[in-house]
């Protein structure tokens, strides 16, 4: 061995494997305002201390690897490493812990949700020291939030574009989601928009299939929009799904929508990917298009309470990547969503500053530094009897989206939309008069039925409908 090698070997380097907690568990650490903070629900393997499991997550999602390496000496680990700085047991759960990890801001590329997730969740979920791992929440510091454009327009700009104020917006997903020709699809859009809706919508898997190519659908839907606008005097829209197999094709479809003069396009942000979504968001801001976001595939990631990622994290990521609407669950329909938890991430989408509130699943105070807000979209198994609860729960800055609850009306599409619009207007008027929607909702709807036969027919059809099931999977 050369003298030079002997000297290097004697200065602070010892080959081999050592416990992660010796380097990455730092309970004395005081977090910085610029740190990205993460709350992981960790289920360690039997015999693995929570400190070691939490430190392993911090290491493998930042600077660490399974063994000591020479090149550790070429940088400052104290500056760049992630730190597990606090651990607390999960109440009511054996061998589960919330491990809090702080990441220095320099670890992340500016304006890239893709890079942020690649670092924080890209490699740690298959790690042997943990039996299961779930990312419950992230604190995005203002210093990092300001590197993102965020939503193309935001809530106030959308209301100004649509000239609609003081009530939730109404939408409808065209059904059947697959199989209609472009002309029949456009006909259904027209009937719904003419009947009183603000928006109609492509479903998440409507792209460009043999039975209906995207360009044909765009043209017939644009015709429906213009005809309905001329007859109602209201601004209308249809979420034209621009999701495609390549980013170039996606932008081409969005550009065609812009040429048609329609107000809004749509993207499946999880299946399409964050890089594609951010690119489309930039295009939409530059070209005056609103951007509706569908969360297709989210339950693959967020439904299990012990493993994966909570939707509040995906919601924060969407606000950073860019979108003016996103589906958020309903609390009352066919898709899962517990009320306080749902309202927690709805606030994270809409508000500028959100206080820590563990009862609603919010682990960190979040300051968005004036980033535009996102409108939550309630959809999935909802109908006219749900209108009072939806109006009370989601408030004005929301889209209430009825698919089967519109197109399933016994008299057809237009009467179905009229029923929904009358129910909404009745609930908004009652709320503005000071009535309690939660307690008096059914009476309000029944009273409105007296002057709307369409609503009366809808109430009769769906009076017995309930979506029963076990309690929500998510727990605090």
Curated annotation (Swiss-Prot):
The disulfide bond which can form in the large chain dimeric partners within the hexadecamer appears to be associated with oxidative stress and protein turnover. The modification N6-carboxylysine is found at residue 201. Residues 1-2 form a propeptide. The record marks 334 as: Transition state stabilizer. It is found in: Plastid, Chloroplast. InterPro entries: RuBisCO, RuBisCo_large_chain_AS, RuBisCO_lsu_C, RuBisCO_lsu_C_sf, RuBisCO_lsu_fd_N, RuBisCO_lsu_N_sf, RuBisCO_lsuI. Mg(2+) binds at residues 201, 203-204. One of its GO terms (biological process) is reductive pentose-phosphate cycle. Its EC number is 4.1.1.39. The active site is at 175 (proton acceptor), 294 (proton acceptor). The modification N-acetylproline is found at residue 3. Binds 1 Mg(2+) ion per subunit. The modification N6,N6,N6-trimethyllysine is found at residue 14. Signal peptide: none annotated. Its cofactor is Mg(2+). GO terms for molecular function: magnesium ion binding; monooxygenase activity; ribulose-bisphosphate carboxylase activity. RuBisCO catalyzes two reactions: the carboxylation of D-ribulose 1,5-bisphosphate, the primary event in carbon dioxide fixation, as well as the oxidative fragmentation of the pentose substrate in the photorespiration process. Both reactions occur simultaneously and in competition at the same active site. The basic functional RuBisCO is composed of a large chain homodimer in a 'head-to-tail' conformation. In form I RuBisCO this homodimer is arranged in a barrel-like tetramer with the small subunits forming a tetrameric 'cap' on each end of the 'barrel'. Heterohexadecamer of 8 large chains and 8 small chains; disulfide-linked. The disulfide link is formed within the large subunit homodimers. This is Ribulose bisphosphate carboxylase large chain.
